[in-house]
Amino acid sequence: MKIRRYLVPNLIAWSIGIAWLIPFMGVLMASVRPYEEIVSGWWHLHPFTITLKNYINALNHPMFPIGEGLKNSLIVAIPSTIVPVIVASLAAYAFARYSFPIKHYLFAFIVLLMALPQQMTVVPLYFLLRNAHLLNTFRGLIIVHSAWGLAWIIFFMRNYFSMLPTDVEEAAKIDGATDFQIFYKIVLPMALPGLISASILQFTWVWSDFFLALVFLQNPEKYVATQRLPLLRGQYFVDWGLLTAASIMVMLVPLLVYALFQKYYISGMIGWSVEK
């Protein structure tokens, strides 16, 4: 009876996993094969020649080297993750632990911001960055990503802080600890899984972004990895080996991040779903 209970969900999960894995395997196989073999069908295993030439050509592309794009993506993604997580954690702790007159209205406004489409804000943001001389700069894009991530990280961390027991904090107050000392030395270590989970999600979102980078970065030398990918397709024909190799390298960074911190996924799911 117990086996039957889990059989159907497991079959569904495995079916979905295989459906996602087959296209990825196709991309991976195309990235390590010569162009002549790819155009005959990536699923044909004879002949099957393994080469790293596609990766080398993608990294050292004469016009849009993906290596420079990966570096630019890291320059944008790392501060765009650290800054909003720090600021949002402070605000989230205030929402979770303190009472002030407009607390509920302000939090409702933050939740409303999460539903705001990027397309509605891109025009005023464009003129704002242009007037501040931040258009076409990494700093401008970092500010936009950081501001855009604040709302959901506040919501995420507020729920996570609300789950934490308050006994240790109350004991620290009795011992004379200040609010900041309690937050820095007690709450943050307890909330480390939630902080890392929020950081992973924010980093992955910034790394995968194409729309904001396309609007605010116009200098080809500053293009991030997601901007360079479609430019590698060629003008007269598509070099599938080059394009798939670049795609694998761009995908590899968030995949590695998820693989290293996968044990925090459960905490992240709880942080989103539980509200106190």
Curated annotation (Swiss-Prot):
Residues 70-261 form the ABC transmembrane type-1 domain. It is a multi-pass membrane protein. Keywords: Cell membrane, Membrane, Transmembrane, Transmembrane helix, Transport. One of its GO terms (biological process) is transmembrane transport. It is found in: Cell membrane. Its main location: membrane. PANTHER family: ABC TRANSPORTER PERMEASE PROTEIN MG189-RELATED-RELATED, OSMOPROTECTIVE COMPOUNDS UPTAKE PERMEASE PROTEIN GGTD. Belongs to the binding-protein-dependent transport system permease family. MalFG subfamily. This is Probable ABC transporter permease protein PH1036. It comes from Pyrococcus horikoshii (strain ATCC 700860 / DSM 12428 / JCM 9974 / NBRC 100139 / OT-3).
